[in-house]
Curated annotation (Swiss-Prot):
Algae contain three forms of GAPDH: two cytosolic forms which participate in glycolysis and one chloroplastic form which participates in photosynthesis. These three forms are encoded by distinct genes. Keywords: Cytoplasm, NADP, Oxidoreductase. Induction: Induced by sugar addition. Important as a means of generating NADPH for biosynthetic reactions. NADP(+) binds at residues 30, 33, 180, 229. This is NADP-dependent glyceraldehyde-3-phosphate dehydrogenase. The gene is GapN. It is an enzyme of class 1 (oxidoreductase).
């Protein structure tokens, strides 16, 4: 059973399918609810390429409705899942079935005193805000030596201010997050940080699912944003 995420619905699906097929298995692909069309077209490509019928099988639907049925089905003898907290629920219900999971994280960038700060700032911005931050490997926190912190903050802030916010078809750097639920979750993290005294280097702005990039300083360990994965800009 292969369950890829919405942000790379083809790339991460293939990375699950290929090893399984090479090892002689048949596979059930359950594409993400927000990436079903990509999964359907990929299966059509496999069929057009001559892959035997039944080798890769597609099941669509909301994970909340069909997830338990799939992950606990007796015919499933391995589960490969990429995502967030859902992986915990799958692992609890799957029993002794082998699991391969890539879940959430809080990826840090560490900047030492002798670093090239222009280079560091460039990669922090690229790592934090590409795909509007909707990547499991996105930079989510920067740990920097005190003696260079203020200068690095200025450089990162200047770069963030240049990011274009808007629609993908307009080549914007920051586009809408995947769902209203995701936007609401991110807003909750931001509001918690504000209530607990974080320094906002950018203004908080939201229009529907479109969130302007947020840059925070003086984040403390009691803030949710210090520990939870925002999966957004």
């Amino acid at each position: 059973l292969a369950i890829p995420p919405f942000n790379y619905p083809v790339n991460l699906a293939v990375s699950k399918l290929a090893p399984a097929l090479m090892a002689g298995n048949t596979v059930v692909l359950k594409p993400p609810s927000q990436g079903v069309v990509a999964g359907i077209h990929m299966i059509k490509c496999f069929q057009a390429a001559g892959l035997p019928a039944g080798t890769v099988n597609l099941v669509t639907g909301k994970g909340s409705e069909i997830g338990d049925f799939l992950t606990t089905h007796p015919a499933v003898n391995c589960i490969s899942f990429t995502g967030g907290d859902t992986g915990i629920a799958i692992s609890r219900k799957a029993g002794m079935v082998p699991l391969q999971m890539e879940l959430g994280g809080k990826d840090a960038c560490i900047v030492c005193s002798d670093a090239d700060l222009d280079l560091a700032a460039t990669h922090i911005i690229k790592g934090g805000f590409s795909y509007s931050g909707q990547r499991c490997t996105a930079v989510k926190v920067v740990l920097v030596m005190q003696d260079i912190a203020d200068e690095l903050v200025r450089k990162v802030h200047a770069g963030v201010q240049k990011l274009k916010v808007g629609r993908p078809e307009d080549n914007a750097d920051i586009t809408a997050v995947v769902s209203e639920g995701s936007a609401n979750f991110i807003q909750g993290l931001v509001e918690d940080a504000k209530a607990k005294g974080a320094t906002f280097l950018t203004d908080w702005k939201r229009e529907g699912n479109l969130l302007w990039p947020v840059l925070l300083d003086n984040v403390t360990a009691d803030m949710r944003i210090a520990w939870e994965e925002p999966f957004g800009p």
